[in-house]
Amino acid sequence: GKYGFCRFDKSKNYTNQILFDSIKPHFRGIAQNKASLFLVSTEKPAVIYKVDKNNHSVTKIFEDKNPNAFYNGIQFWNEFEGIAMGDPQNGCLTVVITRDKGQTWEKVDCSNLPKMETGEASFAASNSSLIVKGNFTWILTGGTKARVFYSADKGRNWSAYDTPITQGKPMAGIFSADFYNDSIGIIAGGDYENQHDNSKNKALTINSGQSWSLLADGQGFGYSSCIQFVPECGGILIVSVGPQGIYFSDDIGSFWKKISNDTDLHTLLFIDKIIVIAL
């Protein structure tokens, strides 16, 4: 599994590779606090690694040995507290949390999580199916059900809310989301096996995800792999990338304009309202 980091002033670039008993881990999520990078690999092994930013030492800090383990994302709320999540085990989402700067991780018991439907899972969508904002957390699902799992207290209590996004097929549902603040959010996805279908694939919430309204139904892009608000723009400007190209909205997602034919991009990261990195 390859990883690396760079500084925008070009003062330092670093790349490396991690092996697990000669196996190359498949990384699906990356997060950081001030001192360390954290990498989560999907399965066989499902492991969280910590990389020291100064001396570049690598430490395996968590391993899920459940044969059904498959991890999709990792984020940090603050310097001390972080969350990683994966596909269901024992009827509930897999959620692990750290409260000590990533030194130890504890799995949330299924009794404290909403029950998953058979065939419902989360997608490993370039780390954008797990969103944190302040103390708030959202996890996206698809398959038989396309729902949003929500916590207002950094993963201690959870609720699940239905969405109108297309669902009922193994590769359909919510793949990506972003929240402008703790109330206004957007979800996107669709049917990965019918990527030109632009119906029921994007929706907006103004109440933290408790209810959702479809946006531009039957218009704009089809399947979206990543959607993001432009920061510091009042929650009005939004960008989506996926196999149909790059799309832009300047009216909270009611209308979309194609601004690039690049179909090879999978994820977006805004540095500020002017600079964005797309991969």
How should each PLM-predicted stretch be described?
Residues 2-21, 45, 49-66, 95-114, ...:
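Asp-box/BNR beta-propeller loop motif
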Residues 22-25, 66-71, 114-124, 167-172, ...:
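Short glycine-/Asp-/Thr-/Trp-enriched loop segments that recur within the blades
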Residues 25-31, 68-75, 171-176, 223-228, ...:
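Repeated scaffold domains used in trafficking and secretory/extracellular systems
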Residues 32-34, 77-79, 132-134, 179-182, ...:
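Residue-level detector of Asp-centered blade-edge/turn motifs that repeat once per structural unit
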Residues 36-38, 80-84, 136-139, 183-187, ...:
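Entry beta-strands of beta-propeller and related beta-repeat scaffolds
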Residues 42-45, 88-92, 142-144, 194-199, ...:
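Short, solvent-exposed loop/turn segments at conserved positions within beta-propeller repeat blades
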Residues 114-160:
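Loop-centered beta-sheet repeat module
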Residues 172-204:
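Oxyanion-binding "anion nests"
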